[in-house]
Every structure is written in C-alpha cells, then in structure tokens.
Regions:
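Short loop/turn motifs at secondary-structure junctions and domain boundaries
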Residues: 267-272
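ATP-binding N-terminal substructure of ATP-dependent carboxylate-amine bond-forming enzymes
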Residues: 1-116, 120-122, 126, 133, ...
C-alpha cells in the first residue's frame, strides 16, 4: 500500500515510476527493461490492507520461484535501470539495512537512511543502548533470550504491566501488552515466533505522538488515538481504526520539545534524509 501510494504520486507529478515487489519481483519482463517504466498503470495493482496481519508463508507460496532468496526475480536488474529507487518497504529486509546494502554494492541510489543506520534503528536493543548513551529518554528495558525456557524466568521479575516485543519487527507486528503474569507467558510464546530475542519494556501510559524529520528539520507532531485499546497493525493501516490529528493539540512548548527529541534521535542513530520517531507524552508532561 505504501509503495502504491508513492508510485501513484510520482506518476501524477510527471515521473516515470513503476512498482516492484521486493519479494515477488516480476516473473516475466521484456528484453529491454527500460520499457517497463512506460507501463500505463505503473504496474500498480489495487492495494488494500487486510484486517489480519499478513501470513508470510502464504506470501512465500505466491512466488513461482521457491528458492531461498529474499529478493524476487529481476528486482535488482530493474533497480539498476532506475535513476532512483524509492524504498516504500516495512519490516525485515525493507528497513533493516539488507536491501540498502545490496543497492549500495550495485551503486544504485535510493531514498532514506543507509544500510548501517537502517540496521541500527531496526534493532530495538541496539538502538535503545544508543539512546541511553546519548541521554535520550526511553522506557526501562531488558533483553530476554533465547527461547521460552530461558526468557520466562527472567520475565517473571518484570513489573507488570509491561511491553513485550520482537527486537526487529515493524508495523506494530510482534508487540504485546500483557497486563498480568498469565498474559505475559502467552505474549512470550507469541513473540518468540518472530525470533529468539525479545525486548521487555516498562509500560508508559499517555498520549501517542509521532514526529517526522525531513532533512535537518522536524515537522509538526501527529497525535494518534486508536479506536481500540492499542495502536496495533489494524489501527495503523485500516481506515477509521484510528484518529490522527496533525498538528497535535499540545502546548507550543511540548511541540518544540517533541520536535527536538525527534531530531536528537534521528542524529543519534545516524539516520539521513527522513525518519519518524514515535513517543509517549505521559501525564506529567514528559516525553519518552
């Protein structure tokens, strides 16, 4: 959906843009790849977000080539024909520096942060170590690994309620908000499906703000109020599942502080071009 929106916007502004799925790629392409950029529809299908989180195994079965590569047929060949690759990707392989590194090795320019900063920002444990070192306020946290037998005894020492999340997830996938010990065990069982390392965080209650950084300046904060209890995958992508207010209805001093915090985070993690920092404004007026 992100890529489709970007592609349509670029084409409406006169650019020769096409949409290529990183994993599925294109099974059949013309001998002259540059002619793809003249496709009348930009190769953009009608895109929608399903109510349920994507089933990765089903997605994998959708590609004829069942090999181990995470990059679909002809993707890199097409990228090498482009003047610029606009990365509209989320999660593993898209935001974690892998595709960025591949494009760097091919000498293909792309949007967003480079491979190292992308990898650092995607790894929540590494990024939180950097934020702590830079004095940027972040909830108390603990890294739990490897497997339920090892993680559960450590988790039982955590104050409740807390936040349990995979260290490398995106789009609010792999994030759980257990309220008690029974929910904590179930959360660990679920989150360990995403990988062997689990991040446990102190739960901070308050208003959810998001601040984007573009270049070297921050943009007005956006406040998100989910229709349900939490801002999960559905609330993030389904129309009507959350109310987003921009600019957020906060005092000027809070807006300034949120912007400065986002810019500090952007610089601390070595990000470039653009980024987005999510934060909580607690009842005492502190930003996390």
């Amino acid at each position: 959906v992100t890529g489709t929106g970007v592609c349509h916007a670029l084409r409406e502004n006169g650019h020769r843009a096409i949409l290529v799925d990183l994993f599925l790629g294109l099974e059949e392409v013309p001998a002259d790849l540059e002619t793809l950029f003249d496709a009348p529809d930009g190769l953009c299908p009608d895109a929608k977000i399903e109510v349920e989180a994507p089933d990765l195994e089903t997605v994998k079965r959708g590609r004829k080539d069942q090999g181990p590569s995470h990059i679909g047929p002809h993707v890199l060949d097409i990228c090498q024909k482009a003047d610029l690759v606009f990365l509209g990707l989320h999660g593993m392989d898209g935001e974690d520096g892998r595709i960025q590194a591949a494009l760097d090795l091919l000498g293909v320019p792309y949007t967003g942060a480079g491979h190292l900063a992308s990898a650092v920002a995607m790894d929540k444990a590494v990024s939180k170590q950097i934020l702590d070192a830079c004095g940027i306020p972040t909830p108390k946290w603990r890294l739990l690994s490897y497997g339920l037998d090892e993680a559960e005894p450590l988790a039982q020492t955590l104050p409740m309620p807390c936040v349990i999340k995979t260290i490398g997830g995106g789009s609010s996938l792999g994030v759980y908000l257990p309220e008690d010990r029974a929910e904590l065990k179930r959360a660990l069982e679920e989150v360990l499906r995403y990988g062997a390392k689990v991040l446990a965080e102190e739960r901070i209650y308050g208003r959810e703000l998001t601040v984007a950084v573009l270049g070297d300046r921050w943009l007005p904060a956006v406040e998100t109020v989910p229709a349900g209890k939490e801002f999960d995958y559905v609330a993030k992508y389904q129309a009507g599942a959350a109310v987003e207010t921009c600019p957020a209805d906060v005092p000027p001093a809070v807006m300034q502080a949120a912007g400065e915090l986002a810019l500090r985070t952007h610089r601390a993690l070595g990000l470039e071009v653009y980024s987005r920092t999510d934060m909580i404004l607690d009842k005492d007026g502190k930003l996390w």
